[in-house]
Each structure stands twice: as structure tokens, then as C-alpha cells.
Amino acid sequence: MANPITQAFFDAWTLISNADSDLISVLGLSLRVSLTATVIAGVLGAFLGVLLATIPFYGRAALISILNTLLGLPSVVVGLLVYILLSRAGPLGPLGLLFTPTAMVIAQSILITPLVAALSRQAISQTWQEIAPLLKSLGLPRWRIAMTLIEQTRFALLIIMLTAFGRAISEVGAVIIVGGNIAGVTRVMTTSIALETSKGEISFALALGFVLLATVLVINICAGLAKRDQAIVG
């Protein structure tokens, strides 16, 4: 008789190699939610990064401090706040977004936007110090300066986006609160791993774990390639 742990690993590999439909469904939803949240956070975060790096204004230092503080914001707190906003008694309750993928996107976006903004500000600030005199001498409008800075820091921003995506797809606290972990609707890899483990379905949990690890590995490889290209160009 095979060892239960060995059998669980074997069954997990079988699920992956056979492209189990439930596994693919969970993976697909995870990617859609996290990619959407990353795009939203990328746009908002890059805008804030440019703003904080190039334009001095009253309260700028305080805003930077708040952003840095939000980097350590617990995901369950984000989930709780979004839950309150989207609940029936909340201000956005009539929209009926609670326990939907949209609610999960909102939670993940709030969670990773400070990360993108803080890291973007650091990257853009360094480039701004180097080329600010040139850009100012050309008399470019602010939007053109912003686009130039984004273009000049594109590799750094790509790495930041990959980091944010990795943070989003591995998140569990917020999405399980606002999504409800509903099968076929809001069940993603992390919440499914937690559920299947509690049910004793170790094989399926392991299969999801392997897929999640593979996803993170691909992200790290892409980030490494981006760093290499940045070093070559820069």
C-alpha cells in the first residue's frame, strides 16, 4: 500500500497532467482577477509615482509616509473595509458587488496600489533627478514629461508590475472575505487551497499549490529577464 503522502503527490501530478477541469477553472479565475487588479493598480500607481516624484506640493511628504505605511497593510483589513463598503448596509451595497469577482478585483487593487505607487515613485524619482534639467529646458508639457519618465523607467515599472501581480495572486485574506470562496464563481487558487486542505483533499490542494508555485516562478523569471534587459539598455 502506497504511503498516503506519496499517493497525494502522485494524485496531484495526475490532476495537473490531465488538466483537471476544476483546476483549470480555478486557475483561470485567479489569473483574470489578479491581472485585472494589477492593470488597475499599475495605472493608478504609476500616476501617483510620477506625481510624487516630480511635483512638489504641500503634504507630499505626508502622502509618501502614508504610502509607505500602507505597504504593510494586512490583507484581512483591506477585505474587511471592502466588505463594509459593498455590504447591503454599506454605501455601495445597491451595486450588488459583494461575493463577486469584481469585489475581489477591488480588494486586490486597493492592496497592491500602494506597492506600485511607492516603488514607482522611487524608480521615477531617480530618473527624474538625472534628466530633469534636460526635460525642463525643452519646455515640454507635464503630460509629455510624465510619458517620457514612464518610457525611461519602463523596465523598472515592468518589474514592479510583476511584483504586484505576484502579491495579488498569492493573496488569500481579502479575497476570501469579499469573494466568499464560492465554487465556480469566486474560488481562486489560494482560497481553494485553504478549503481543500481543511476538507482533507490534500491531492487537489497540492495540485493547486504546484500551479501557484509555477506561476510565481514564471513571474520571477520574467522579472529577472527584465532586470537583465534593463542592465543592457541602461
Language-model region placement:
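Transmembrane alpha-helices
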Residues: 119-120, 142-174, 228
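Hydrophobic positions within alpha-helical transmembrane segments of bacterial inner-membrane proteins
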Residues: 34, 38-50, 76, 80, ...
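Membrane-interfacial helix termini and adjacent extracytoplasmic/periplasmic loops
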Residues: 4-14, 21, 78-110, 179-182
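Transmembrane-helix boundary motif in ABC transporter permease subunits
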Residues: 36-67, 142, 149, 222-227
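Alpha-helical transmembrane segments of multi-pass membrane proteins
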Residues: 29-37, 70, 143, 147-159, ...
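Interhelical loop and adjacent transmembrane-helix boundary motif
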Residues: 16-18, 178-217, 225
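C-terminal transmembrane helix and the adjacent membrane-cytosol boundary/short C-terminal tail
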Residues: 118-130, 136-139, 143-148, 206-234
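Periplasmic/extracellular loop-to-transmembrane helix junction in inner-membrane transport proteins
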Residues: 1-38, 55-57, 149, 198-201
